[in-house]
Amino acid sequence: MTEVNTTQSTQARIEKILNENPVVLFMKGTSQFPMCGFSARATAILQDIGVKFYDVNVLEDQEIREGIKAYGNWPTIPQLYINKKLIGGSDIMMEMYEAGELQELLK
């Protein structure tokens, strides 16, 4: 297996995505076709809230997949960012959603 280093160009690509989109979900698959249960749950939460979000399919780009883990110092996918700030994965999203906190952040 080849090791992928998180390069400055990968970090710059991630920062560009975050700068251009207020709500970003780095996920496995797309919002139309999630490829894992956690990504499906994260997508469903955001769709239920009715917020527009930008999805990034990490399965299509190994550099982004590894780079986003390093960028946010978070080991798993999906990862939700709101206004360039890492919120967390699907478990944290669900907890915040059930408490009404995620809806407040997305107003």
Q: Model-found features: residue ranges?
A:
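Thiol-based oxidoreductase modules, predominantly thioredoxin-like and allied folds used
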Residues: 50-65
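Non-catalytic, surface beta->alpha helical segment in thiol-disulfide oxidoreductase systems
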Residues: 82-107
